[in-house]
Swiss-Prot record:
Residues annotated as binding Mg(2+) 1: E261, D305
Name by which UniProt lists this protein: DNA primase
InterPro entries xrefs: DNA_helicase_N/primase_C (IPR016136), DNA_primase_core_N_sf (IPR037068), DNA_primase_DnaB-bd (IPR019475), DNA_primase_DnaG (IPR006295), DNA_primase_DnaG_DnaB-bd_dom (IPR013173), DNA_primase_Znf_CHC2 (IPR036977), DnaG_bac (IPR030846), DNAG_N (IPR013264)
Family in the record: Belongs to the DnaG primase family.
Lineage summary: Bacteria, Pseudomonadati, Pseudomonadota, Betaproteobacteria, Neisseriales
The gene coding this protein: dnaG
Domain of life: Bacteria
Length: 590
């Protein structure tokens, strides 16, 4: 976990205006900067960037956040990747676990080694791209595949010359440690030679565009057809996808991402205008791949050959996706005719028919899930139904998306003819409990007893986000029972007060990332942005804020006193409740 003080320092050294202006040309508009939103199509600028509060907001689509949030959303990076991206820009080293970064010399050495490896793969990619220009056989192969110079350049395709040590033309001495560590050169008991020879080369880039590895394809029928870089300090095939960096703009424009099996499929699809394709790197689609895909788009499509190998790969992808599923994301599976792969299909039928098949003939995960599991099972028999329950049970248990999990279990209930309550018991879950009126008196949530309070609480949260220094005016007694938005307000104030200095709004938002109150904070902050109430408050506003806090405290104390009095009349109070009531009554008098 990255320390919060590091995030604070990183944001303090980062100017969000510079970060966004590199991607979206900004124009000064009053105190803020404006542009057309990069996250949706629009003609009139509604995307605002605040240099003082260091956050962005789109008044049309609602996108908002700090510099970290922008990099995550715009480049499709995870939180740690976005932090690393910004840290590299300002020369900071992201702290690692287990005290790896305690020693400055160790940090510097590690950073130097990382840079050397990155420079090595970049130089190799340039070498391969240059070699392609001078090899007629390689150029003829790509020409036969119908690839234009623009697509070849966009994906950085190249050619690894035949021979044992072509990289000696670039790297001296040969070999060196970096060549071996990046997998470019094989060390076979002291004998060194290039891994990639006489192959079309596909550079593999990380989300920041840096070359981290390669895939190489033969020009003839030699084996292996594809050869990939091994896992290295730069490259992990289970956590990277080919074409993700090159296709990021097309993915955003289409609103979907397409997973295919081979590098050439990705490039061929791009040649025909389908630029949102990616491919796994010599491995099945992993859970990490699914996480990455879901960060890129709401709709994820898998397109595989219709043969047994393709269907096996599709099912592996589905299995690995189950724990990562979300109710606002959808997965679809398209199986092409056995004689086709995506490359040959789009060449034969064109972009329009390919996308029509993708959108209208692909099967949603829910349909493919039951189709695959039911294959070969006789559901007209009791034994078949029992088998389906048994085989689906461990898979259903992995699904954490609540709505989808519920609907899939409802579908299983229909398929096997078992009542949902009884089926839940078979699946190892408790059946839904009947509503029974509780005998024990429970203190009511303050939002129920005082419907005006959530609105007032939200106003205070909004004011605190805009003016973090006002947290000094919030002092909540320990004995108060807090829930809902009031608990959120208390946590927000405590977070700000624990900060060594008064944080900016963007820093506060990042501190709340991953907390139980993140959704509430974002909802209220978004409301403030939409209402354009984001200017800092003056002296009168600060006084009103303090009055509001006092009013909330009084309302909360009164509500809890009344609840305890009612319980005292009904069933009596225990010792802790008596002490609580005494504290509340004493506070009320003061």
């Amino acid at each position: 976990m990255i320390p919060s003080d590091f995030i604070d320092e990183l944001l303090a050294k980062t100017d969000i205006v510079d970060i966004i202006d590199e991607q979206v040309p900004l124009k000064k508009g009053g105190a803020n900067y404006m542009a057309c939103c990069p996250f949706h199509k629009e003609k009139t600028p509604s995307f605002s960037v605040s240099p003082t509060k260091q956050f962005y907001h789109c008044f049309s689509c609602g996108a908002h956040g700090s510099a970290i949030g922008f990099v995550m959303e715009h480049q499709g990076l995870s939180f740690p990747e976005a932090v690393q991206f910004l840290a590299d820009r300002v020369g900071m080293v992201v702290p690692k676990v287990h005290g790896q970064n305690d020693n400055p010399e160790v940090r510097a050495e590690r950073k130097k080694k990382q840079q050397t490896l990155e420079e090595t793969t970049a130089a190799a990619a340039d070498f391969y791209a240059q070699q392609l220009k001078f090899n007629p056989a390689a150029k003829a192969y790509l020409d036969k595949r119908g690839l234009s110079a623009e697509v070849i350049a966009h994906y950085g395709l190249g050619y690894a010359p035949d021979g044992w040590q072509p990289l000696t033309q670039v790297f001296q001495p040969y070999p060196n440690t970096a060549l071996v560590d990046t997998g470019m050169v094989i060390d076979n008991e002291g004998r060194h030679y290039d891994r990639f020879r006489h192959r079309i080369m596909f550079p593999i880039r990380n989300p920041r565009g840096q070359v981290i590895g390669f895939g190489g394809r033969v020009l003839d029928d030699s084996k292996p057809k594809y050869l990939n870089s091994p896992d290295t300090p730069l490259f992990d095939k289970g956590k990277n996808l080919y074409g993700l960096y090159e296709g990021r703009a097309a993915v955003k424009e289409a609103g979907r991402i397409l997973v295919v099996e081979g590098y050439m499929d990705v490039v061929a699809l791009a040649q025909f205008g389908v630029g949102y394709g990616v491919a796994a790197l010599g491995t099945a689609t992993t859970a990490e791949h699914v996480k990455i895909l879901m960060r890129q788009a709401d709709s994820i499509y898998f397109c595989f050959d219709g043969d047994s190998a393709g269907r096996k790969a599709a099912w592996r992808a589905l299995e690995n996706a189950l724990p990562q599923l979300k109710d606002d994301k959808s997965l679809h599976f398209l199986f092409l005719p056995e004689e086709h792969d995506p490359d040959s299909y789009i060449r034969a039928y064109g972009k329009a028919q390919f996308e029509d098949a993708l959108l209208n003939q692909s099967k949603p995960l829910s349909e493919y899930f039951w189709e695959h599991l039911s294959d070969g099972i006789h559901l007209n028999t009791q034994e078949g139904k029992a088998e389906l329950v048994k085989t689906s049970s461990p898979l259903l248990a992995q699904i954490t998306a609540p709505a989808l999990a519920y609907l899939l279990k409802q579908r299983l209930s229909e398929l096997v003819g078992i009542d949902p309550d009884n089926l839940a018991q078979l699946l190892g879950q408790e059946a839904p409990k009947r509503h029974v009126k509780q005998k024990n008196y429970k203190l009511p949530p303050i939002s129920v007893k005082q419907p005006v309070m959530p609105t007032l609480v939200q106003r205070q949260i909004r004011s605190l986000l805009i003016n973090p220094d006002w947290a000094a005016y919030i002092d909540l007694p320990d004995y108060l029972a807090l829930d809902g938005d009031f608990a959120c307000l208390a946590n927000l104030a405590e977070t700000i007060k624990n900060h060594p200095s008064v944080p900016a709004t963007a820093q506060v938002l990042e501190h709340m990332r991953g907390s139980p109150y993140e959704e509430t904070i974002n909802r209220i902050f978004r409301s403030a942005l939409q209402s354009e109430e984001m200017e800092g408050g003056g002296e009168e506003d600060c006084e009103n804020f303090q009055i509001g806090i006092k009013k909330l405290l009084n309302e909360l104390k009164y509500s809890q006193i009344e609840a305890l009095k009612q319980k005292s009349l009904q069933s009596g109070l225990n010792e802790s409740e008596k002490k609580l009531l005494l504290s509340l009554l004493t506070a009320k008098q003061n």
